[in-house]
Curated annotation (Swiss-Prot):
Domain BRCT as annotated: residue spans: 589-670
Organism name: Geobacillus thermodenitrificans (strain NG80-2)
Active site: K114
Essential cofactor(s): Mg(2+); Mn(2+)
Gene Ontology cellular-component annotations: cytosol
SMART domains per record: BRCT, HhH1, LIGANc
Protein name per UniProt: DNA ligase
């Protein structure tokens, strides 16, 4: 066909394919078979290949994925994407309603399912999709336009030539998640923990073709500039978005009272497992925009909305065995082996049993029906036994008397609940020490994870951490899935680790009771490994937060010939043994806003790791703790901050975003 014919046919195909795509991906009512859709798509691809100038921004071929990007650009949100305060029970919801009515009188609410995905912003100009971005810190996100184009339920052109900015949740349906993990397992790749992580990881791929292959979906749940468009309520905004061609979740309800809201919440607590996607709660918003304006917002969240979070999901499965593992300090830990079961979006086959006393107290037996939940929706644990299901075939479990790895006798030290293997040459302990030494919190050797360490250990290439610094490229390329480039990268990472500051090495050595914070304090105080090795118990206890038990452990470690030999080897290989940080002085903390403050970190910081942030806080005289309480002074919230941020808001604790934190660091360094 000539160019004019091609132009007409391309326009026809775009109209057909966009309509068929809307019917399939948004309405879920396809009017043509998949084969016909594919045939028309191939015809359009062929025309656009022959006549590239005929390609338009709303062409369905743009969803296939363009060339890889070098990096994501930063995007400043015109209207901040605020997080929501949380409710965990009916009382919290009634308190929210009481606050709303005290301020604005009677109010209607809109209840929507809280999709467990990634919050995004999508911007249109004259009806055409021009930019999409992640939420980021609420003010600044990342430009993921090309990846969002691959989501077929997101319109590239609206039904009206309107300019707007909509907010939505990109997610991975359960079926897509299962299929993706099956494919990754077949290729020997690491599995995604849950659909939310899979969706977030897919949208942060620099290659849009990867995102296109992941079969993501998107529900739009809000309009940033609704009032500019003359829309007066949230429910009207959702209807308008739907009329423009957006996919809006039909499972929503306008409620006149808080009792109706609670009924909706309870309804979806029961119906949640039936959905083809994961939800983790219900979002409740005041419907009237006028009332929303009257209610206003705090620094982080609107006062006119709240997110009800479902309680941690509990499921019942069968305990088919108990496996005993040996950690790097010799502690022997029992782990439940379970019939695979879905819990909070992931398939669980293993769960912690803590120790022998826990098993005895719960009377947990092999063959029992056990109750599983995820602590914090992350770590699977056995919380109880369904005794009524016992049929007499269950077998009580007895902890072994000897190490499952080296056959050494296990002992229980005074005051401890764990059994321990005291053999310093135990293969399991050596392997776990290597994994710990290379970990991100310690020497941070990129590419040296558990699988590679196990291969190195099993091949006899390493027996202790000093052996890592003798590895050669020839040795590494002989390992499974280790090519020349990977070997070169790993050797470069090992070489780079030699320059780490003393606190990382000290933590990496795995001295009992010496965590990352204690390592930081010791390194800062003694400045060199030589001074630390020579320190007496009293000198160690003079360091803030170093108690008698830790001091005893440190002096015992440095008195062992094996430890002395290891440190001498590391020195020979050029591993740094000095503190590189800025030594704290009396003046330093006094000048800082963080001096003497108790600080909690939550969420992901774009500019530094969690440990680096912790180091900066401690350098400025602050103290980092892991949980929010009334004694917390400041919470520093990064991207995807969770329950800690919510609790801080409820307690009225000062909250910093990453920009505020960086400003304080910069001010102190001037």
């Amino acid at each position: 066909m000539d160019r004019q014919q091609a132009k007409r046919r391309a326009a026809e195909l775009r109209e057909l394919l966009n309509r068929y795509g809307y019917e399939y991906y948004v309405l879920d009512r396809p009017s043509v078979p998949d084969a016909e859709y594919d045939r028309l798509m191939q015809e359009l691809i062929a025309i656009e290949k022959q006549y590239p100038e005929l390609k338009t921004s709303d062409s369905p071929t743009q969803r296939i994925g363009g060339p890889p990007l070098e990096a994501f650009r930063k995007v400043t949100h015109r209207v901040p994407m605020m997080s929501l305060a949380n409710a965990f029970n009916e009382g919290d919801l009634r308190d929210f309603d009481r606050r709303v009515r005290q301020e604005v009188g009677e109010a209607a609410y809109v209840c929507e399912l809280k999709i467990d995905g990634l919050a995004v912003s999508v911007r249109y100009e004259d009806g055409y999709f021009v930019q999409g971005a992640t939420r980021g810190d609420g003010t600044t996100g990342e430009d993921i336009t090309e990846n969002l184009k691959t989501i077929r339920s997101l319109p590239l052109r609206l039904n009206e030539p309107v300019s707007l900015e909509a907010r939505g949740e990109a997610f991975m349906p359960k079926a897509s998640f299962l299929r993706l993990n099956e494919e990754r397992q077949a290729r020997g790749e690491e599995l995604f923990a849950n659909p939310r992580n899979a969706a977030a990881g897919s949208l942060r791929q620099l290659d849009p073709k990867v995102a296109a292959s992941r079969q993501l979906d998107l529900f739009v749940y809000g309009l940033a500039n609704a009032e500019e468009l003359g829309i007066e309520s949230h429910s009207a905004a959702l209807s308008y978005l739907q009329s423009l061609g957006f996919k809006v979740n039909p499972e929503r309800r306008r409620c006149a009272t808080i009792d109706e809201v609670i009924a909706f919440v309870n309804e979806w607590k029961e119906k949640r497992p039936q959905l083809p996607y994961e939800i983790d709660g219900i979002v409740i918003k005041v419907d009237s925009f006028a009332q929303q304006r009257q209610l206003g917002a705090t620094a982080k969240s609107p006062r006119w909305a709240i997110a009800y979070k479902f309680p941690a999901e509990e499921v019942v499965t069968t305990l088919i065995g108990i496996e005993v593992n040996v950690g790097r300090t010799g502690a022997v830990t029992p782990t439940a082996i379970l019939e695979p079961v879905r819990v909070a979006g992931t398939t669980v086959q293993r769960a912690t049993l803590h120790n022998e006393d826990f098993i005895r107290e719960k009377d947990i037996r092999i063959g029992d029906a056990v109750i599983i939940k995820k602590a914090g929706d992350i770590i699977p644990e056995v919380v109880g036994v369904v005794v009524d299901r016992r049929d007499g075939d269950e077998v009580p479990f007895t902890m072994p008397t000897h190490c499952p790895e080296c056959e050494s006798e296990l002992v229980r030290l005074d005051g401890e609940v764990a059994l321990r293997c005291l053999n310093p040459k135990c293969p399991a302990q050596l392997r776990e020490r290597l994994i710990h030494f290379a970990s991100r919190s310690a020497m941070n050797i990129e590419g040296l994870g558990e699988k590679v360490v196990t291969q190195l250990f099993n091949a006899g290439l390493v027996h202790d951490v000093a052996d890592l610094y003798q590895l050669t490229k020839e040795q590494l390329v002989g390992l499974e899935r280790m090519g020349e480039k990977s070997a070169a990268n790993l050797l470069a990472a090992i070489e780079a680790s030699k320059q780490n500051s003393l606190e990382r090495l000290l933590f990496g050595l795995g001295i009992r009771y010496v965590g990352a914070k204690a390592a930081q304090l010791l390194a800062e105080h003694f400045e060199t490994m030589e001074r630390l090795e020579a320190a007496t118990k009293d000198e160690l206890m003079a360091v803030p937060e170093i108690g008698e038990k830790m001091a005893d452990s440190i002096t015992t470690y440095f008195s062992q010939p094996e430890a002395v030999e290891l440190l001498n080897e590391l020195r020979t290989y050029g591993v740094n043994m000095a503190y590189k940080g800025r030594k704290r002085t009396a003046e330093t903390p006094a000048s800082s806003v963080l001096a003497g403050k108790t600080v909690v970190l939550t969420g992901k910081l774009a500019s530094m790791s969690r440990n680096e942030a912790k180091e900066q806080i401690e350098r400025l005289g602050g103290r980092v703790t892991g949980s929010v309480s009334r004694s917390t002074d400041i919470v520093i919230a990064g991207e995807d901050a969770g329950s800690k941020l919510d609790k801080a808001q409820q307690l009225g604790i000062e909250i910093w975003d990453e920009t505020r934190f960086l400003q304080e660091i910069s001010r102190e360094e001037q």
